[in-house]
Amino acid sequence: MRKIIHVDMDCFFAAVEMRDNPALRDIPIAIGGSRERRGVISTANYPARKFGVRSAMPTGMALKLCPHLTLLPGRFDAYKEASNHIREIFSRYTSRIEPLSLDEAYLDVTDSVHCHGSATLIAQEIRQTIFSELQLTASAGVAPVKFLAKIASDMNKPNGQFVITPAEVPAFLQTLPLAKIPGVGKVSAAKLEAMGLRTCGDVQKCDLVMLLKRFGKFGRILWERSQGIDERDVNSERLRKSVGVERTMAEDIHHWSECEAIIERLYPELERRLAKVKPDLLIARQGVKLKFDDFQQTTQEHVWPRLNKADLIATARKTWDERRGGRGVRLVGLHVTLLDPQMERQLVLGL
C-alpha cells in the first residue's frame, strides 16, 4: 500500500507578505490586480476570507465585500524563492515529488526510511521544518492514494494535517460528498444530486455501465474515486505543458482593430516566456482566448510547428468574427501548447 502526502501551503502568497511585513498580519490583505485594471484576486489571507474574499474573484467585487482590504501587487520572485526552499525540504525525505504549483505538491514516501517509515510523522516533521526555516505554515493530508491525500490536506486547515489510513478509507468514502472529489465542479455536482447521487456511498451502489453512458470518461473516474481507486503515480518528471499571456482590459473592447493592437503588445511577452522554456520556439499548437462581457469565454487553437504572430492574428480574427456575437470583449489571451517530449524525440529521429 502506498503512502502519499499532499502538502498545501496556507494562503501562500499572502503568508509570505505577512512574514516579511508583520504589520499586515492582522488586517485583511489580498494579492491581485487593481480594480481600475479589472484584475482578479490571486489569494487572500484569513482575515480577508472572513469577509468572503476568495481566489479568482474580481478585485472590484472583493473591495465591495471588504472596503478596507489592503491590495498588494505581488512579489513573485519572493514567492518563487520560498517555493524553491520548500521543495528542497521535501527532497530531504523523498525524491518522488510532484509539484502542482508554487504552493502545493504530492510526495510519495512509501519507501522513505525517515521517521521509521511513518508518513504521518514525515508530514508532521516537514510542516515543522517549513515553519522553522521559513516561518510559513503548511497543511498536509496523508492517504494511500493521491485524491484522498489532497482532500485530507483541506480537512484541518490552516496549519494542520489529517490522516486517512487504508483501514479507514471505506468508512470515509461512505459519507464523502462527491463535490469534494477533485474535478467535480458545481455543475457536475448539481447534475449528480439531481440523480440522487450526493456521496461516494451513493455512487458505489450505481452500475458502472449507466455512469459511462451518462457521463462518458468522467463516469469511470467518478466510479473509481468512489471506490477509493486512484492508480495515478506521483510523477516527479511532470513537465510544463503550456505557456500563455493574457490581458484584462479596463473597458470592454468592441472593434477588431483594438483586439489586434492588444495582440501586438502581448506577442513579445509570449515570445519571451516561451524562449525561457523552449529557446528554439518549437511548439505543438498555438491559440487565442477571448472572454466576453458576460464572462463566457472561448478558445481557438491551430496546429503550428513554431510560434507565429501572423497565424495567431488570423486565428484571433476568425474567432472574433465567428464567436463574439456582438458582445464586448474584456480579456484577450495568447497561449502555446508545448511539444510532448516523446513526440519531439520522434520528430528529431525522423530527420
From Swiss-Prot:
GO molecular-function terms, A-Z:
damaged DNA binding; DNA-directed DNA polymerase activity; magnesium ion binding
Matching Pfam families, A to Z? IMS (PF00817), IMS_C (PF11799), IMS_HHH_1 (PF21999)
Cell compartments where the protein resides: Cytoplasm
Which residues are catalytic?
A: 104
Top-level EC class, please? transferase
This protein's assembly is summarised as: Monomer.
Q: Which HAMAP family match?
A: DNApol_IV
Task: Give the protein's recorded name.
Answer: DNA polymerase IV
Q: Which organism is it from?
A: Escherichia coli O139:H28 (strain E24377A / ETEC)
- Gene name on record? dinB
